[in-house]
Amino acid sequence: MAQWWLILLGLWTVLPSLAGGKLLNVCMNSKHHKQEPGPEDKLYFECMPWKDNACCTRDTSWEAHLDEPLLFNFSMTHCGLLTPLCHKHFIQAICFYECSPNLGPWIQPVVPNRQEEQRLWDVPLCLEDCEEWWKDCRTSHTCKADWLHGWVWDQGKNGCPAHAPCLPFSDYFPTPADLCEKIWNNTFKASPERRNSGRCLQKWFEPTHGNPNVEVALHFAGSASAPQLSYSITAFSLCLLLHA
């Protein structure tokens, strides 16, 4: 019987890391993502932080920098040009979404129980990321808080719905959290944690300082796998007791 308890102890030790590993260093199953992350030494400007290990290609990184990114067939100039600083935040957010291999814990199927296409859900952006994005965009204009749904499409281009006036971002997004969480329909979540806390993700970082999101993904991958593993190993433990 002692040998079974040794095996059980080993399971408690090893399985969490194995299960969490499935959520690490992965790419989404999505239109523009590579199947596996890897080096891409010719990524454009704001996508460069991921050049050593990226889920995006050079072409994807180039398209992310356009005023009307071909990636989503979506015009960010529906209420006129964004300010340069505001536009830069959106480029960084698109690069983060397309290039990061550290988003595994937040990947969800678009259709429940099917993995043909995936999306991100509640990615915890650091407090400073949301605050700076909101501050630099509050004087730019938009006509909607949800940029994923409810547009009027004409000749393949998105336009504002009737009775949806172009107003400063701050009218549609009164707080930094509103901007982070509403604009792409809960793709991001405004975290109360700060950068370098190990508990939130940065949508951009200095490449020379290393990727801080690796540690964060590791933490959340372990947290995500813990409940299911605990249930499975507890059930196995009860079986051992019943047959002792």
UniProtKB/Swiss-Prot annotation:
Secretion signal, residue range per the UniProt entry: 1-19
Region of interest (Important for interaction with IZUMO1), ranges: 62-81
The entry's keywords: Cell membrane, Cell projection, Disulfide bond, Fertilization, Glycoprotein, GPI-anchor, Lipoprotein, Membrane, Receptor, Signal
GO MF terms held by the record: protein binding involved in heterotypic cell-cell adhesion; signaling receptor activity; signaling receptor binding
Entry GO CC: external side of plasma membrane; microvillus membrane; plasma membrane
A biological process term (GO) from this entry: sperm-egg recognition
Subunit record text: Monomer. Interacts with IZUMO1; the interaction is direct. IZUMO1 and IZUMO1R/JUNO form a complex with 1:1 stoichiometry. Interacts with FCRL3/MAIA; FCRL3/MAIA replaces IZUMO1R/JUNO as IZUMO1 receptor after sperm-egg adhesion, thereby permitting species-specific gamete fusion. Interacts with WDR54.
Protein name, entry field: Sperm-egg fusion protein Juno
Gene from which the chain derives: Izumo1r
